[in-house]
A protein has these predicted regions:
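A late-sequence structural motif
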Residues: 136-174
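Residue-level signal for short, function-critical loop segments
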Residues: 9, 49, 153-155
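Generic recognition of short, well-ordered alpha-helical segments
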Residues: 17, 33, 56, 162-163
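Central regulatory/effector-binding core of bacterial HTH transcription factors
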Residues: 1-34
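C-terminal regulatory
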Residues: 12, 28-144, 174
Length: 174
């Protein structure tokens, strides 16, 4: 069996574009699709250990504005996303050293020491364990959002789709 993986931060029309399945972060309301939630994710502030050695740890939200912040902004989305509004929801209006339109770019920028970024916990946990990233202001929590397998409704599941579904279930049980 082989698989083709297509990664994007853009919204897709799963059925129209002929995909067998998708992974969606957040709540999805589409009657043409069925969803199965495998996990929840939240957003955490993090920075590289090198950045924190050089610039120090902010002690509160107000101190964030004097740090180098990595802002994620995705103008193509029709509704606000958890990452886009992260700093605004905290009341932080300045300190943006870098604005990117891609979560992976923010992730790699944070690892390279460019600043403090709001990133999904599932993405940064391995880097916390390796000591490459550290949490900043760990008392700040965000609402959890589901990680969902998305499938076209009224379509028979192929063996490869069932295998993919089983793989996801196993992966997220860890």
């Amino acid at each position: 069996m082989s698989a083709e993986l297509f990664l994007t931060d853009h919204s897709l029309e799963l059925v129209k574009q002929g995909f067998d399945a998708g992974i969606h972060l957040g709540h999805l309301q589409d009657p043409a699709l069925i969803t199965e939630t495998f996990a929840n994710h939240s957003v955490v502030l993090c920075a590289s250990t090198d950045y924190l050695k050089k610039f120090g740890h902010p002690k509160n939200i107000a101190e964030l504005e004097s740090h180098r912040l990595i802002k994620i902004s995705s103008m193509e989305f029709h509704q606000p996303r958890q990452l886009d509004d992260y700093f605004a929801n905290l009341g932080v209006q300045k300190g943006f050293h870098l604005t990117v339109n891609d979560t992976d770019m923010a992730y790699h920028s944070a690892i390279m020491g460019a600043g403090i970024a709001p990133l999904p916990n599932y993405l940064v946990m391995p880097q916390f364990e390796r000591g490459r990233l550290s949490r900043v202001l760990p008392d700040i929590d965000t609402d959890a959002h589901p990680v969902q397998l998305v499938l076209p409704a009224n379509r028979h599941l192929s063996s490869k789709t069932v295998s993919f579904k089983n793989f996801l279930a196993s992966y997220f049980r860890r």
